[in-house]
């Protein structure tokens, strides 16, 4: 499958993180994943995409700030649920720290934000978005139909990855034109920061692109630190070597010295967002 195949999350205590993602969020061990030879990686099925937990040991968030969406890079990962309040109560009882309690949000959805044990920012969201601008009526209707069929008790399933970028046109040229992710719609939050969210279908999940008219801060990601939290995005491509050449022409940079990941190739987009190109399957 092309599109977003997984998100990589760094853990300081792998057993604790496995308890969180498996026992609390309900994700299952994934078998037959051929993208990583290392023993530090544990793969979990999270619905339409995977979670890759990496045992980092001693490390930190590398300057990433969960409370500053003006910081370019990966901002959060979102899970679709049947009922945000129901899931939030369960998570709160387990001691999970919420950064935003359940609330109604722009787009007529309900959401909440919380942190994993190492500070990765996660979201639960229910319902379906009512876009201010719709580019694909078919994809928007698919979301509406899925929400109508989702049981109230449905637990978390991979829904989206959110990123903050500097230039929307450049980002669309990369993800839409070079990678083929289809535009779904937009929500214009406005406000003093000029906040706009653009949604692209990236395989079975969605890429949420945050842009602001307010000044942004640089992406603090670097490849050579034991980073905890949100470490990268795996994208499925037919041929990783060909994809790197094609994406380089669209503005990506291959990370020098990367040893590969069972056929995957590591690169960054124009905002420094780390992407691992892996064989689509």
Question: Each predicted region: which residue ranges?
Answer:
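Acetyl-CoA-dependent GNAT
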Residues: 56-58, 127, 212-214, 280
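Vicinal oxygen chelate
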Residues: 3-12, 41-49, 63-154, 186-189, 198-200, 241-281, ...
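Short, flexible, glycine-rich and Lys/Arg-enriched loop motifs at helix boundaries
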Residues: 187-194, 214-218, 222-224
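N-terminal beta-strand motif that seeds the catalytic metal site of vicinal oxygen chelate
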Residues: 1-18, 74-79, 127-172, 184-187, ...
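Short loop/beta submotifs within extracellular cysteine-rich repeat domains
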Residues: 28-29, 51-53, 60-62, 124, ...
């Amino acid at each position: 499958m092309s599109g977003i195949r997984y998100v990589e999350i760094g853990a300081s205590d792998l057993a604790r993180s496995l308890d969180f993602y498996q026992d609390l969020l309900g994700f299952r061990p994934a078998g037959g994943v051929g993208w990583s030879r290392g023993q530090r990686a544990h793969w979990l099925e999270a619905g339409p995409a995977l979670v890759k937990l990496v045992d980092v040991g001693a490390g930190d968030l590398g300057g990433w700030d969960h409370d500053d969406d003006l910081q370019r890079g990966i901002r959060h990962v979102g899970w679709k649920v049947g009922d945000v309040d129901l899931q939030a109560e369960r998570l709160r009882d387990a001691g999970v720290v919420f950064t935003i309690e359940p609330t109604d949000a722009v787009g007529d959805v309900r959401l909440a934000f919380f942190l994993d044990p190492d500070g990765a920012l996660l979201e639960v969201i229910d319902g379906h978005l009512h876009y201010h601008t719709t580019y694909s009526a078919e994809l928007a209707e698919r979301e509406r139909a899925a929400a109508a069929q989702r049981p109230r008790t449905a637990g978390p399933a991979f829904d989206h990855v959110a990123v903050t970028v500097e230039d929307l046109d450049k980002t669309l040229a990369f993800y839409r034109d070079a990678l083929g992710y289809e535009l779904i719609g937009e929500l214009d939050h406005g406000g003093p920061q000029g906040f706009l969210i653009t949604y692209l279908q990236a395989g079975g999940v969605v890429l949420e692109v945050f842009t602001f008219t307010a000044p942004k801060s640089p992406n603090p990601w670097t490849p050579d630190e034991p980073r905890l939290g949100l470490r990268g995005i795996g994208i499925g491509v037919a041929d990783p070597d060909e994809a790197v050449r094609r994406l380089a022409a669209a503005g990506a940079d291959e990370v020098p010295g990367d040893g590969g990941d069972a056929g995957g190739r590591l690169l960054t987009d124009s905002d420094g967002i780390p992407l691992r190109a892996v064989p689509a399957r």
